């Protein structure tokens, strides 16, 4: 983009209104609350990932056990032909 497409440059330092002490304290309070919220969300996300991992491992373990315990070869070894009835 060229300079004409970007728009005019704004100099904030010269024309920006000065913030009073109450506004600065309010900004710090909001920033602290936001940091607390971010930490809480990170903790919740970590716990959700751990729970999802545990559930995934459990599902794979149950699936693996069921495949191992009911193998096709063992299942067909016990199969007997039905006896034919002679009339």
UniProtKB/Swiss-Prot annotation:
Pfam families: Coa3_cc
Protein's cellular compartments: Mitochondrion membrane
Mode of membrane association: Single-pass membrane protein
One Gene Ontology term, aspect cellular component: mitochondrion
Disulfides per UniProt: none
Keywords, ordered alphabetically: Membrane, Mitochondrion, Transit peptide, Transmembrane, Transmembrane helix
GO biological process terms, semicolon-separated: mitochondrial cytochrome c oxidase assembly; positive regulation of mitochondrial translation; respiratory chain complex IV assembly
Lineage top rank: taxon: Eukaryota
InterPro entries: Coa3, Coa3_cc
TM region(s), chain numbering: 47-69
Phenotype caused by lack of the gene: Deficient flies show developmental delay, lethality, and a dramatic decrease in the levels/activity of COX.
Its biological purpose: Plays a critical role in the biogenesis and activity of cytochrome c oxidase (COX) (complex IV).
Other observations noted: Encoded on a bicistronic transcript that code for two proteins mtTFB1 and CG42630.
Membership in a protein family: Belongs to the COA3 family.
Entry protein name: Cytochrome c oxidase assembly factor 3, mitochondrial
Upper classification of the organism: Eukaryota, Metazoa, Ecdysozoa, Arthropoda, Hexapoda
């Amino acid at each position: 983009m060229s300079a004409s497409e970007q728009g005019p440059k704004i100099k904030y330092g010269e024309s920006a209104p000065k913030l009073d002490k109450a506004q600065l304290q309010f900004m710090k309070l909001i920033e602290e609350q936001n940091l607390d919220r971010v930490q809480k969300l990170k903790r919740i996300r970590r716990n959700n990932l751990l729970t999802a991992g545990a559930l995934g491992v459990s599902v794979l373990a149950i699936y693996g056990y069921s495949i191992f315990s009911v193998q096709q070869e063992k299942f067909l070894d016990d199969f007997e032909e039905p006896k034919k009835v002679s009339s």
